[in-house]
């Protein structure tokens, strides 16, 4: 067991809590508004508290956790949608995730916690690759995502856009050594993690107390990906023999 705790926003049927318990992390609470997914997660994670609508939550009053995860609604970012971007009613809920993280950290600091002890220390965000190109002007939404996450611990942070004509890369990182802050993102395809279809998603990890985010997202996940590919080969071989 790692002793780590996590909260899941936009929880759905509990993808983040499932990953958490498989790695010794305790899912403490989840925010979801749809009845069926809540029933599913209550069955699989009976000890996880359901806290309700994200827009009605106060991060300072939630049980503090070391990790806050969330895949904010993707409909306004997806290339298959109308592409209202972060200004859209659904995908704009990303800002609620930022608000809750800020409120929880402020409450912890008011209790006297500092440095790596301030919760949450980590934030994970997941979304569709369309987030790289959505916005007005084009590519603006992901710039805002990066900037707002930096502002959790660097209030006056400014994030420039990508190089003209290039767009955002599929993987990248930000290191702010003077603030002990790091952020990394990469686009992963679920076909390499045991799913029988192509399903690309952006995964972004922020570390508000050190420069470890790239190490966790790149090095640690590469080891897991290699393990997943080996397991997938074994499964394929078994299916072929049967």
Label each PLM-derived region with a short phrase:
Residues 57-65, 77-242:
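Class I S-adenosyl-L-methionine
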Residues 65-71:
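Short SAM/SAH-binding signature in class I
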Residues 15, 19-26, 44:
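A short, Lys/Arg-enriched amphipathic alpha-helix followed by its capping loop at the start of a domain
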Residues 2-6:
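Extreme N-terminal starter segment of soluble prokaryotic enzymes
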Residues 30-31:
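The conserved SAM/SAH-binding core of class I Rossmann-like methyltransferase domains
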Residues 34-35:
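Conserved SAM/SAH-binding beta-strand->alpha-helix loop
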Residues 8-14:
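Class I SAM-dependent methyltransferase "Motif I" SAM/SAH-binding loop
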